[in-house]
Amino acid sequence: MHLKGRSMLTLLDFAEDEIKFIVDTALQMKRENYAGRRYWGLLEGRHLALLFEKPSTRTRVAFEVAASQLGMSVSYVTKSDSQLSRGEPLKDAARVLGRYVDAIAARVKRHEDLETLVEHSGVPVINALSDKFHPTQAIADVMTILEKLGRVRGVKIAFVGDGADNVAHSLALAATSLGADVRIVTAPGYEPLDAVIAAAEERARRSGGSFELVYDPCKGVKGADVVYTDVWVSMGLEAEREKRLRDLRPYQVNSELLKCVGKDYIFMHCLPAHRGEEVTEEVLESSRSVVWDQAENKLHAQRAVLALLVP
């Protein structure tokens, strides 16, 4: 399957078979990496720009390591240390970066800024997190589910917390594409974007999976194979902190809520975790938690995305 030259702003732009191909490639590259068969030099001579407007630990380092492993060189640029901080239009910066580099991975406050980069740079742009989507995280998430449970089709995934979260959006699109039964367990007013709901329902219909919104936290996690949460106060939403903590408190993933599952399950979190808010220390550090393996898979997912998209 040929994906060279494509951008990845959202998984809405990728068909179900393309998402499966990316996940399968990431798993294959991970296995071969551990077997000593490396992909060093696959993108020798290419250059990646990391254009980050928000802080990052895992995503930034994973892109830097993945690019290096593939033979790429990397330039890390933040808004504060570039002319963007002095008012240079993003489209002007995009025009120049597109003449210097072979691809851009960008972490932005406004998803629309990614579209500006695509329009004016002329090179593949990869969403390293926006206010609406986090597609490379979803690739890592599906990888983790496949590794831990052996399948995605028919797996019951309960995402608990802020249903309008960028990770929730991308997970719903990726998992329903591969036949999972996805529940977004959230409070009224925190539902996913209408476009995400419509796309997830359509993908679930085609794949044999399902998608639903559940407002009761105990009912939402009942029978789940995967219980997943993310922070309640995403970057840029700090002004809403107290309201969000109050509204989402009943959706904390703790030992009491997990009694409602009633079966074996795994716990997932994209990190960083705010212990005592969306999840308790006990759950995060439990034997059912796979968050550290999940975090490692960000490296393998992002390496596959670079290998497949960068010309």
Curated annotation (Swiss-Prot):
SUPFAM superfamilies: Aspartate/ornithine carbamoyltransferase (SSF53671). GO terms for molecular function: amino acid binding; ornithine carbamoyltransferase activity. Pathway: Amino-acid degradation; L-arginine degradation via ADI pathway; carbamoyl phosphate from L-arginine: step 2/2. Keywords: Arginine metabolism, Cytoplasm, Transferase. L-ornithine binds at residues 166, 230, 234-235. It catalyses: carbamoyl phosphate + L-ornithine = L-citrulline + phosphate + H(+). GO terms for biological process: arginine biosynthetic process via ornithine; arginine catabolic process to ornithine; citrulline biosynthetic process; L-arginine biosynthetic process. Its EC number is 2.1.3.3. It is an enzyme of class 2 (transferase). It holds the Pfam family OTCace_N. Carbamoyl phosphate binds at residues 56-59, 83, 107, 134-137, 270-271, 298. GO terms for cellular component: cytoplasm. It comes from the Archaea. It is found in: Cytoplasm. Its main location: cytoplasm. NCBIfam families: orni_carb_tr, PRK00779.1. Reversibly catalyzes the transfer of the carbamoyl group from carbamoyl phosphate (CP) to the N(epsilon) atom of ornithine (ORN) to produce L-citrulline. This is Ornithine carbamoyltransferase. The lineage of its organism: Archaea, Thermoproteota, Thermoprotei, Desulfurococcales, Desulfurococcaceae. The gene is arcB.
